[in-house]
């Protein structure tokens, strides 16, 4: 599919309410660096985080004035920073939704996890909003479910690249790669049918090291890759790791899975350390948690591993079959 496939001129005048819960996700092969128009420099693979989600409600009404209006609240309260971002996003995608020019939108979003703390809140929030808009459009179109999923991912990407991976799951790929025939830079695809069953209910526990906002936004982090001296090598490694991870996910080989995902996590943080200006995303307790994971794995031979997002928090990954012992370790 190409961009023109997602342009819709059809419109209508009606009132209604749509609601959507959309999960966050954690990348295994990381997306870090982009071209124009939210096109990734390399493919990425992620697990969806079903228990970390954004709830978004969109009420639409025929516009009251010549210019349509967009009203946004976060958890029921006005938030001018978020409202500006949402307004800019919706205005940037109006050519893909014919109904937008005829309607005022009243949007409320809320997360069940800390915002801007390294859990991908932009992924869940943008994908939830995109899903609501496509659901509104579906009232006047005859597009099938597969097309609607693609469009939801496509629109999500324009708001936040990683959001494209939050539409489906539990295992999702975004970015063109020879390793997957259906892959695209424009939207993410669900690859769960190509992975071993052990990864369908793989566990993720998030250690909140610091609930505050990230040191640097993901957008600025991507921008810094444009002049990072190691960027080209990084993109090459990520492309190779995507192909390698495809085979690992299919075979269910956990030791190799751990090797790639932990390497990817540390590489992203090392890239930020080598950027100009540089940023230290970890906190002392982040490193302490990582050391404890490595020690636990050496002692028990269980498959507890870690990955990181662009923040201080640690995502612990482990198979469901090992939950009982690993949960005791985490709780202590």
Question: What is the predicted role of each segment?
Answer:
Residues 1-117, 131-145:
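ATP-binding N-lobe of GHMP and related small-molecule kinases
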Residues 1-27, 33-37, 194-332:
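C-terminal nucleotide
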Residues 88-92, 162-174, 240-243, 248:
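Charged/polar, low-hydrophobicity segments characteristic of intrinsically disordered regions
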Residues 78-81, 120-124, 230-233:
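Short alpha-helix boundary/capping segments
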Residues 78-85, 125, 148, 285, ...:
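Short amphipathic alpha-helical segments
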Residues 27-30, 54-58, 163-166, 170-173, ...:
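Short beta-strand scaffold segments in enzyme catalytic cores
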């Amino acid at each position: 599919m190409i961009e023109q496939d997602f342009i819709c001129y059809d419109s209508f005048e009606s009132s209604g309410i749509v609601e959507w819960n959309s999960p966050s996700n954690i990348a295994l092969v990381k997306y870090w660096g982009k071209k124009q128009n939210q096109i990734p420099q390399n493919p990425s693979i992620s697990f969806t985080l079903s228990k970390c989600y954004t709830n978004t409600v969109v009420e639409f009404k025929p516009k009251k004035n010549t210019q349509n209006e967009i009203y946004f609240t976060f958890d029921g309260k006005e938030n001018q920073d978020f409202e500006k971002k949402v307004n800019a996003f919706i205005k940037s995608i109006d050519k893909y939704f014919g109904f937008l020019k005829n309607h005022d939108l009243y949007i409320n979003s809320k997360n069940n996890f800390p915002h801007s703390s390294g859990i991908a809140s932009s992924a869940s929030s943008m994908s939830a909003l995109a899903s609501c808009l496509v659901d509104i459009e579906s009232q006047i179109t005859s597009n099938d479910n597969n097309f609607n999923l693609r469009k939801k991912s496509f629109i999500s990407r324009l708001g936040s690249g990683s959001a494209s991976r939050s539409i489906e799951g539990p295992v999702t790929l975004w970015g063109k790669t020879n390793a997957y025939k259906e892959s695209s830079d424009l939207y993410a695809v669900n690859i769960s049918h190509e992975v071993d069953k052990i990864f369908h209910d793989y566990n993720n526990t998030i250690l909140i090291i610091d609930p505050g906002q990230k040191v640097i936004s993901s957008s600025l982090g991507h921008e810094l890759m444009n002049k990072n001296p190691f960027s080209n090598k990084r993109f090459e490694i990520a492309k190779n790791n995507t192909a390698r991870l495809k085979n690992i996910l299919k075979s269910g080989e956990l030791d190799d899975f751990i090797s790639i995902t932990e390497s990817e996590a540390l590489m992203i943080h090392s890239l930020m350390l080598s950027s100009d200006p540089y940023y230290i995303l970890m906190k002392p307790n982040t490193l302490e948690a990582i050391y404890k994971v490595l020690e636990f794995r050496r002692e028990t031979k269980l498959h507890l591993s870690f990955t990181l997002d662009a923040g201080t928090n640690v995502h612990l990954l482990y198979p469901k079959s090992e939950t009982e012992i690993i949960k005791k370790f985490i709780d202590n």
